[in-house]
């Protein structure tokens, strides 16, 4: 409970920290015809000076936590106004301003628990915190706010903030109960009307805003979510009007509504990063297209050296196009034009030691364990591999790879022995793409469903043994697949064919990675948790305080993705093989999504990459001991789970207290039945009846938002910045003997490879986007950190959190030591690129390391 009684007429000194809107404002992007934006607009706003806050434009009223009025609500103090500017305060962050305030409070009003704030100005500001000092018998009271405050006339009820106490609903001081309930009611809204910029309402909707049917049938996209054909997690509701041609689709606009406090309220270089993403998709993309239309630059790369030239000389572009790109700070940083008429990219890590090591079989295989998509490979349990596609519709899709293909390279084992010894592995890109392959190949892209079988060698590395490329059967789907099997070769035209076979595999892997491993399994699945948490858990609820840092900026980046990246004609559709079917195909994969399998140990066991073994440190034994993502990930997973367990057990003294928590039960019920409503009847959902269920659920949410996202996101440019290594689409089939393409492959294998994979224009767009996505913002908050040290007043929770941070620091040292162990060949590989993606800390920029708390880019 806060403090002791205050003496009658006692003055309480306070400090209010806020940020002016003009400090945080990023100009909207102007039309393509003009200069793209102006960066941060640091001057010329309505709030020219801090003195605008002095006088009576902002009022605060303290609320008692122990003394109630006639309605049973905490007593209100007198309205008080900001008094003076504090010019020096050591704890002030960038762009923050501090003001003095003095409240009158008497002992008849009891102990402080909350405050109201009103803004009478026309312009909103960002309230960071209120700190009350020298409270008798207590010291300081902290209110962590981090919220936009708009003009009071825009709201039916006053804005309220609670002190940093933590209460289960049953433990809330009686005078605060109604305030707590009212605030949650305000955040839920009534589910009607179009949401306005200043609102903080959290609600659900289906993904019905990716297409633009009013532009024509070709621009329509199916509704994802709310139907059995395309189930999907829910997104935040905006309430925009339906399109004219399709009442089930929502009209698009240049700004996507977000609950106001989900938009950036911090001076973050990711303001620039996300602004850069928007600029690339809306402005740079058409500008580059015009350069290609004018034939200013050849449409194809001519050689691998020309691709490497992107990082030295760059791509020459017309002066007027450069002049439109370079004024924007983020793009100046991304493209490094250096005053030259060229776009230049930083050299990706994968070629910093060797320009050709990416071509080796060992590196191709190693990236399945330590690359940007390290959680798809599985242990082969049956041979030949079979399909789960409905044979009534698609016929027989059993693999055509035979034992004779594999056994010459099994180090003396038979296939059966290799399977028994868990030494054969499969990277399967067959079932997700096959039902769409006819449609994909009817466009300018040409691709295969692929299966890759690999063998675990005695030295602990993986060796690819065979790649199967499959097409829909010419005689119709029910006839099964038409398949070819390719084997490794290291010289002659066969080696060029083998390199192409690997490229078709990587194209599928790139698409699956971007749309499923990255977008669906982190960004999209987390959004319903954010919505449910904010609708049902009060800010003083212990689980809200646990999870809230792991939601930072996620709805914002997801809204931007719907606007510019995964929409009709967006960056993903333009640069990835799946094209217009991209997000639709991820919905088909979501049918197999299981929440409880998102826990790393469960995922590894499901893929056959680990076996339950209580004698091992994490309760499981890895099938491949040197599996960098799994080895490092298990350390992080355990640290998260230990921290969550300690924290949950501080507040729930028994399973009964959890079952009787109305906020938690309502939150979980709605998450299952609405947020992931297309999965509501699945038997695997935790019933949320025990503390252990809550621990596991919270650990999965935190793991997904932090470490899993880091593992699949921040390696995108280090690995994929070389399009040769991670092509995103393929444009022609494997050349057949006797054809002109085969002859070209024999005479000029590099040119044939480049004519097959992502062309130059799409490469430039892809690199521009993944370079931004792979960067850390300057004020990123990493796992084990909080953006405010006063996030809770509970010293027990603070001590447990400190132990968590210390554990992560120890893990970081251990991971770095592993990278120096030459016996662990999969950690660095032929490209000599140590696996650092799960090192918790990082500096700003393109670092190939660091685990942010949340999906913030």
From Swiss-Prot:
Function of the protein: Plant lipoxygenase may be involved in a number of diverse aspects of plant physiology including growth and development, pest resistance, and senescence or responses to wounding. It catalyzes the hydroperoxidation of lipids containing a cis,cis-1,4-pentadiene structure.
Q: Which reaction does it catalyse?
A: (9Z,12Z)-octadecadienoate + O2 = (9S)-hydroperoxy-(10E,12Z)-octadecadienoate
Please report the stretch or stretches of sequence annotated as the PLAT domain. Answer: 38-163
What GO biological process, any one, is recorded here? oxylipin biosynthetic process
One molecular function GO term is: linoleate 9S-lipoxygenase activity
Q: Would you tell me the protein name for this molecule? A: Seed linoleate 9S-lipoxygenase-3
- Cleavable signal peptide: none
Q: Where does Fe cation bind?
A: 518, 523, 709, 713, 857
Explain what the record says happens when changing residue 630 to T.
Answer: In strain: cv. Provar
Q: What is the effect of changing residue 57 to S?
A: In strain: cv. Provar
Q: Where is the composition biased (Basic residues)?
A: 234-243
Q: Which Gene3D superfamilies match?
A: 3.10.450.60, Lipoxygenase-1, Domain 2 (4.10.375.10), Lipoxygenase-1, Domain 3 (4.10.372.10), Lipoxygenase-1, Domain 5 (1.20.245.10), PLAT/LH2 domain (2.60.60.20)
Q: How does it assemble?
A: Monomer.
Pfam families associated with the record:
Lipoxygenase, PLAT
Q: What is its EC number?
A: 1.13.11.58
Database matches in PROSITE patterns: LIPOXYGENASE_1, LIPOXYGENASE_2, LIPOXYGENASE_3, PLAT
